[in-house]
UniProtKB/Swiss-Prot annotation:
GO terms for cellular component: membrane. The chain crosses the membrane at residues 4-24. The gene is LASP1NB. It is found in: Membrane. This is LASP1 neighbor protein. It is a single-pass membrane protein. It comes from the Eukaryota. Disulfide bonds: none annotated. Keywords: Membrane, Transmembrane, Transmembrane helix. May play a key role in the skin fibroblasts (FBs)-keratinocyte-like cells (KLCs).
Length: 25
């Protein structure tokens, strides 16, 4: 259960970084 929470946490961080990079482009 904790592993799923960590994966979701990193997935959200990845989406934020990806959207930030797209915003800079």
């Amino acid at each position: 259960m904790l592993d799923i929470f960590i994966l979701m946490f990193f997935a959200i961080i990845g989406l934020v970084i990806l959207s930030y990079i797209i915003y800079l482009l």
